[in-house]
Amino acid sequence: VDKSREGPLRDLLLEPCRDPAVIEYRLDVLDDLVGNEALSRCFEDLVPVIGALSYFISRPEHDDWSPFQETVWRLRELEHYAECVKKLDAAFSGGYGKAADGSVADGSAAGEIVLRSDALKRLRALTTRLTADPAFMRLLERLPELLETIDRIKSVTIGVNLNGALQPCEAVLLTVGSKSFTGSGLYDKLIGRDGTHGIAPLHSADTGGFAANPLMVPLFRDLAMVMNRTVQPVAAALKEFVSLNGRMFVRLRDEILFYVGAVRLVRFLNSRGMPMVRPLIEPPGAGRFSVRGLYNIDLAIRFGREADGASLPSRVVGSDL
């Protein structure tokens, strides 16, 4: 689990819900995910996508941000938003991981999946509305072109004049390139280089607090101006998608993480021969508790990770209470 998400998950586990209706609601979701390999895999795949989406949505406000930076951030937000919607749409329609023969990764036939939980039914209905949104359909059409405009910017070429003492005295921005530069190596020196290979090692930026070279200040200003001009068509196109927002997925991230972890746990223990069953919730105040085969789940996890996991039922003994 990402360190930044440990707090919410810890609170959820240390202060468990006691409302029977909510518990049943969540167990329905867990049943659906455990019973559908493709849907649970979709949820796992969504975690890093939503993490990236959150990064581009919750960025700090910068008064000095250029139009180029604002445009790139918004475009990346829409890119990850579209990926979330497409993944969910494929999963709910039974086509997640669909192969050429029409089957999905777990061998089952593609087709709309059967859901029991109200939560996932509502999420499917929401996904259906999002995919039918004309703005979203236009986004899918325009997104490859808009991303290509940004992604092709890989490098800039700078020309530097030297004075009589061979010190840099003047600089000019020459080109914006579609290939990244690389440093030189022995192999490059032996076979020759193309225009993107340097004649010395490639150096990374040092952000250790050193002041910028005065020569670089106007150069960076020119670079910002060029970049702003480059993304002007993209910025204009993005105004069409102002109604699209991925915050709903960011709000779901902690819930998705919880269910992903729960599904992994159930499947892990089941694969080692340990039962995991849905409890029957007694009404509040009933004062009854009955269980058969109760076992120490911490021991089961630790022993189950050993090479001889198949022998787990004989090593972790359950008790009836």
Residue ranges and their predicted role:
Residues 1-165:
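Conserved amphipathic alpha-helical "coupling/scaffold" segments
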Residues 58, 86, 90-93, 163, ...:
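Charged/polar positions within long, soluble alpha-helices
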Residues 255-321:
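Conserved NTPase motor "head" modules and their coupling/switch loops across ABC/AAA+ ATPases, GTPases
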Residues 67-70, 74, 220, 227, ...:
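Amphipathic alpha-helical coiled-coil segments and their boundaries
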Residues 150-216:
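Structured, charged N-terminal subsegments at the starts of enzyme catalytic cores
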Residues 74-77, 230, 248, 252-255:
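Amphipathic alpha-helix face/heptad-repeat signature
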Residues 208-239:
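Extended, charged coiled-coil "arm/hinge" scaffolds of SMC/Rad50-like chromosome-maintenance ATPases
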